[in-house]
């Protein structure tokens, strides 16, 4: 309804006395959406304090690699995360592929990134087991075709669902009309989980800690830029049409690193839910595999080498 500027000023002064009155003023008098921060914004220095020195590209406790790919109009950004028992997380790699997303040359470089091999601390090589690739902002068909190229279970196209309470990831039981499994990622739920883990106090690098998040002492992979992107968002209450809604808002700050972490975490969760991945069992299996004598060592032992092994 029509009102004078003088009345608006009086309404504003009255509203300042009461937070609920302020919400009403913004929603009704100004006709705008009221937003209120629910918690303190996480400082990026909290993440810089979690930097540790890796002994190899993939630290010893890591048993599973996933990746998240964020799609932009002029580039793709991919972050590779390693997972240890208890969902202890280690950032392993960051790859930025510049170029038009619909050009084959650009996509071939993404292919190479997806198939990149990483040296584990035990000397073996690891590849990325599962990828969640964002379909937002570009033609989804681009991601669909790459999913079919790399394997529809290995590379999963995803779309975000900014609805509080949604599962971290929901994978359909059947393929869509394009022949792929288009998964829905509960971005708000994932961010709530991950922010709680990022906020936790750092622990010593040699101490296995469930839910800990660790970053490499390598500025090519992790620096203040990536740390700031990871903490770019904050949880706010948004009042719309008389109803309160919780959501994560980046306030127009860059947040690609966070989006990629969300997708990489979703790739881990779907591996647990759909394929019964057990990180603890996998760790035990890897340990048994690395301590098992090789055929050469067994042959040396049988031939009577010194201490059971030949020189």
Predicted regions and their residues:
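Metal-dependent catalytic core segments for phosphate chemistry
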Residues: 18-23, 31-40, 71-113
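C-terminal nuclease/phosphodiesterase catalytic domains that cleave nucleic-acid phosphodiester bonds
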Residues: 138-300
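A contiguous, basic/glycine-rich beta-loop/short-helix subdomain that forms a polymer-engagement track
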Residues: 1-66, 79
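Short His-Asn-centered micro-motif
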Residues: 69-71, 129-136, 158-159
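Short, well-ordered loop/turn elements at secondary-structure boundaries
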Residues: 59-64, 71-76, 85-86, 121-129, ...
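Acidic, Ser/Thr-rich low-complexity intrinsically disordered segments
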Residues: 296-311
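A residue-level signal for conserved active-site and pocket-lining positions in enzyme catalytic cores
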Residues: 29, 131, 260
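Short, basic/hydrophobic alpha-helical segments
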Residues: 101-130, 146-147
